[in-house]
């Protein structure tokens, strides 16, 4: 059993001890499904951390979006600094899937942009699953998409040991076949170089270099090396170099795949010609033959994922291998905000197949392209072992699966009660809202306002801004990483009010928010359903002066149930506080930069843009990191940032733009000074 070392400055309190005991008992008894029904702010993540530590199993924590996944990853890394807490989300900065619109005869080619840092974290996750037992992977729904074959990925890895005799030429060929490229001038992730008796590799799973020093054919030493300074960071006895891509296809399987694709093409062309679809047949033949030539010559083609079934040797309709298949047999699945995440699991497959069917019917893809897909709902649950659903408002399906194995967590360790709920008439609501905002802002408290439409949110934001209110507007078109920055600025007090539609409900840890305002609360629908109202009200549940204002002209069933549940919890919490002599106190949790914020900074530094932009970023990080590691990018992240800045500095110097290069040099010195002071 792996040993998890849970580190926290506090012990379980309130309902946490009973919840932990109940969940651990259920896991040890082999219960397939359990539900942690935990009110907002009751410390569900800490409860889950204790569950993982006490059961000692590798765990997959599933979140429904990148923002929540980043928050969970950060929290779990704080609880388990000595264990492997990994982060696995979609590595696309931008993704436009291949599609065809028959009405306008418009073909849309696939376009995408891969975030190298997130790709590195994905590789780090699978590496940890192969090499360690104490692994927690925090993932988004993207983990149910195909991810190569774990056994082939592991088999293709190259192992080096000190004292081992190797054939250097053979090793280099193995690296190339594993999709590493040789570059003796500049080395980075996915590259290697040879200098005399020294082989340096940029592994896919790390931003450090691996240096192998040889004496003849013998490996004399193995070490991790700083890619910028060349400084040896630590020595190793052995190391596995995993492929640069998760999709590994041996030569014999590639040959078999090409034969299978040719056979499928022949059968499909016969079918299309019999149906009189001559244009579709010609289109399919032309595209597929070109792809086959590319596969034969270079082992790759654009859209190669559409041939994934053949390349992996799967049967038609069979489930693809995904992240779950990299886990050992005995693992634990934890689904956060399950009332949102579980419906997502069910929807992913249907949405993917609808798009693929159009492409197949019109001759853009072979029928086997439909097997390049996410898992079906039933396939996912067949792969899953023991599951714990986590939500303040679990869905009916989760509750029905858990039956008697439902653990409730209502008491907050801080003693803070659920917010008071007031229903006020809509007449004069804007002026009333303005008064409440000013009252809260004067106390340095934050306010969330939810509307039904984007237009209403925009108009309200403009009105509040005209009345000298520091306000921002959050909408669905904002990139997930930028969304984190907006929420971060709210916590740091850059502004007081955040207006949104459906972006403020689940999983956001905002202890500074004391007032939540719900406009048009009596308009029944998805955004004003019982669960949505409870979740939105819960955004003020971390503040001692928490208040939820519902503007409505009538009391709907959803409103009545949401208010009743909030009052029930509030009464339980109040009685507990009185019996134990507890005085509610604020959570006092500092705002901290998420892992995604740093990845976004790295992405912007990698893009072509004005030097002033990334100099400003460096200045901001210097300012934040000088305060303390919680208010800015962590010190552990600074080496990679320095490397990015140094790369830009060299480019400017090469372009003879010495003035801007000197500015960057000065910023780098300040960041290095911060590192030395650790």
Curated annotation (Swiss-Prot):
GO biological process, one term: SOS response
Domain UVR residues, every copy: 639-674
Keyword DNA damage belongs to the record: yes
InterPro entries: Helicase/UvrB_N (IPR006935), Helicase_ATP-bd (IPR014001), Helicase_C-like (IPR001650), P-loop_NTPase (IPR027417), UVR_dom (IPR001943), UVR_dom_sf (IPR036876), UvrB (IPR004807), UvrB_inter (IPR041471)
Residue ranges annotated as motif Beta-hairpin: 91-114
Helicase ATP-binding domain residues: 25-176
Subcellular location: Cytoplasm
Pfam families hit by this protein: Helicase_C (PF00271), ResIII (PF04851), UVR (PF02151), UvrB (PF12344), UvrB_inter (PF17757)
Subunit architecture: Forms a heterotetramer with UvrA during the search for lesions. Interacts with UvrC in an incision complex.
Family to which the UniProt record says this protein belongs: Belongs to the UvrB family.
Record protein name field: UvrABC system protein B
Organism, as annotated: Prochlorococcus marinus (strain NATL1A)
